[in-house]
A protein has these predicted regions:
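Conserved beta-strand-loop-alpha-helix hinge in the C-terminal portion
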Residues: 225-251
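Helix-to-loop junction immediately C-terminal to a conserved catalytic motif
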Residues: 53
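A short, flexible loop at the N-terminus of ABC-type nucleotide-binding domains that lies
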Residues: 1, 10-24, 74
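H-loop/switch region of ABC-family ATPase nucleotide-binding domains
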Residues: 205-206
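Conserved ABC transporter NBD signature motif
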Residues: 61-69, 228-230
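The feature captures the beta-strand-to-loop junction immediately N-terminal to the Walker
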Residues: 38-40
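ABC ATPase NBD coupling module
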Residues: 15, 69-83, 91, 113-120, ...
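Q-loop/switch helix immediately C-terminal to the Walker
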Residues: 96-109
């Protein structure tokens, strides 16, 4: 379970550039929840993920992960419990290392460092089986340098690496930099990995169709607060025009992202 309790964060406090990104945010994710998150620019979406990941420290409130208060836990210590995939496909992998070496690094994240004989044959066989899930042929290119892969292949590999330890998963617009066809494929892989591994997931997206189609719950943020929280049959019946109308109703504004309108 992941709980965000009355969390607030203001950047540049006490200056003319002060910006309240999170304003008493409250959110509870039960185990296995796949929650999609939308909102206009500056709504607080990425700040929320950064707060959970420990990239930033919150001003007030607390963050509880599986009953443990991690509010002040350093980012590197949270890595054992959290997997994150960013928008840029180049960020999650080491380009000069082989595919199997990248997987081995991810496999050992958060584990105690010991002397061992590198990648064992058992490791290699396990990685091959994991790569087959992607259906991209990467299981036949284990020793290829990751820098030779396409953006979509690298993002799919990053996603697999992020889920090896069965963590809570944070997805920060992880398909936004991909072409539509590749983005759809990565989203299908995402859905499969989340479902098969029963991963608790927070996914930010500007694609309203994806926000509606994937996951069991949909949140909309506005001015650092959750203004919509939709699940079940209500979510299943939603259309993009419905969602745009709901946003206008609760926020008093038009949704300000062209990608959402074109999705």
């Amino acid at each position: 379970m992941l709980e965000i309790k009355n969390v607030s964060k203001t950047f540049n406090p006490g200056t003319v550039n002060a910006k309240t990104a999170l304003n008493g945010l409250n959110l509870t994710l039960n185990d296995g929840d796949f929650v999609t998150v939308i909102g206009g620019n500056g709504a607080g979406k990425s700040t929320m993920l950064n707060a959970v990941a420990g990239t930033i420290q919150v001003d007030t409130g607390s963050i509880i992960l599986d009953g443990r208060d991690i509010t002040r836990l350093p980012e590197f210590k949270r890595a054992a419990y959290l997997g994150r995939v960013f928008q840029d496909p180049m960020m999650g992998t080491a380009a000069t290392m082989q595919i199997e070496e990248n997987l081995a690094l991810a496999d050992r994240r958060g584990k105690r460092r010991t002397l061992h004989p590198g990648i064992t044959q058992a490791d290699r066989e396990r990685y091959i089986e994991q790569l087959k899930i992607l259906d991209l042929g990467l299981e036949n290119r284990m020793t290829a340098k990751v820098g030779l892969l396409s953006g979509g292949q690298r993002q799919a590999l990053t996603l697999l690496m992020a889920t090896l330890q069965k963590p809570k998963l944070l997805l920060d617009e992880h398909t936004a930099a991909l072409d539509p066809q590749t983005a759809q494929r990565v989203m299908d892989i995402t859905d499969r990995l989340v479902r098969e591994n029963h991963l608790t997931t927070l996914m930010i997206t500007h694609n309203m169709r994806d926000a509606i189609h994937y996951g069991n719950r949909l949140l909309m943020l506005h001015n650092g607060r959750i203004v919509l929280d939709i699940s079940g049959e209500e979510k299943a019946r939603l259309t993009v025009p419905d969602l745009l109308a709901l946003f206008s109703k609760v926020s008093g504004q038009e949704y300000d992202n062209d990608r959402a309108l074109l999705a």
